[in-house]
Amino acid sequence: PSYNISGIEAAARCAGAEVAYVDRSRFRELPIPGGKAIKSWAFNDAFVLEDEVDVLINVPIAKHHSTSRLTMALKNVFGMVGWDRGRLHRDIHPKIADLNRVVRVDLTVLDAYRVLRRHGPTGGMLDDVDNSVDGARRIVISTDPVAVDSYGATLFGLEPGDIGFIKEAHDAGLGEMDYRLKGFEELTV
């Protein structure tokens, strides 16, 4: 898994965290309160039940996606759901917002150090990846995944409202689309 390859798993364990992987036996259907496009779905209960997890940290990477346009914090919760995820890709934007009504992430750390600009989500060639100072080399951290994705959209030259799932999640009250209202500050290290 990418956590092992990236060094995230070792660093998290060193800091005392329990690193959990998706256990297919723990999927169960849960209602989606206020769901617009889906009313229930199979979720991995280890990640969504409050008595199972103290803090849920989402560590997505910023990349192009052929169906949703981008995949970052909000889209990354697809890794915590079961059933036929292909069904989620039809009319995807409200479904991404609906899944985030159940999966409530405490902290998002968006890895935009290298950004996949084309041919996502899997990538095509090395030329599809940008790691320039102007277009990438960012780590975005927030308790608000909508704000994270809103800032992330700007790295692709897009406005947050250009991405359907960001607007859907904001309209559902899941976070702030204007990331500047969340006390955004850029640090150079």
Predicted regions and their residues:
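N-terminal and secondary-structure boundary signal
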Residues: P1-V189
